């Protein structure tokens, strides 16, 4: 396990009280190169949107959905934070573009439109068919959560998430990875790879990365595949902690530094260093 495991252990002590679930495995064999509490189920914010994309891709593959189908946003779908559609004038988009917005910029409005189209129950059923017990998308995206709403958007464990990403990759080129490939959030583990967040679909510096992140107060999650000259790795780095709402609090900085440290170890491993 070497340097990857060492970086994971350093992360565990980076922020007092933080809970981590971490797993890194070989892309081809599934052999572990590092882990810590990989079965712990933590909040994963937007990572759970993967399940909606998987359900859509499955329907397309079975001929039950057409990516050219145009869907409209409604007032009930509107939500702030991540995404572009809320800033665009267009009211309707084909499902292909809705999925690309979710994969590329974790678009919250597009997520709500897709979930309304698919049905949240179908997404839950898909998770069960995939054999997932911790990885769940619990709800639509909301600006505020009331006591009547599920307390978190999504959850998961590092072990199940690395298994899910590895399965997506082993199935060969597919829609879900195509939607994730241009993803612009390289601010967490992937910040160590030194790639252009806006243009990294092609191999750069000998590296190729596909990932999905999740961000909320006290939640950071990065799940991905990184391939280099020596090998490919699948990783899931999840962390939950109590983040004070004070300008001078450094807990987030410590968490981000630890995630980048893990990314540096992953980069060295896939490069053969």
Where are these regions (language model features)?
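Active-site SXXK
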Residues: 30, 43-71, 235
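Short, glycine/proline-biased beta-turn/loop segments that scaffold the active-site neighborhood
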Residues: 62-88
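Short glycine/serine- and small hydrophobic-enriched flexible loop segments
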Residues: 54-62, 116, 163-170, 264-268
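Beta-lactamase-like hydrolase cores
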Residues: 1-43, 265
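Structured C-terminal helix/loop/strand segments within mature extracytoplasmic catalytic/sensor domains
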Residues: 1-9, 33, 169-196, 203-206, ...
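Conserved catalytic neighborhood of penicillin-recognizing serine enzymes
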Residues: 78-112, 120
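Mid-domain, small-residue-enriched loop/turn segments at the edges of structured enzyme/sensor domains
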Residues: 16-20, 115-172
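A short glycine/serine-rich beta->alpha loop
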Residues: 35-43, 84, 88, 100, ...
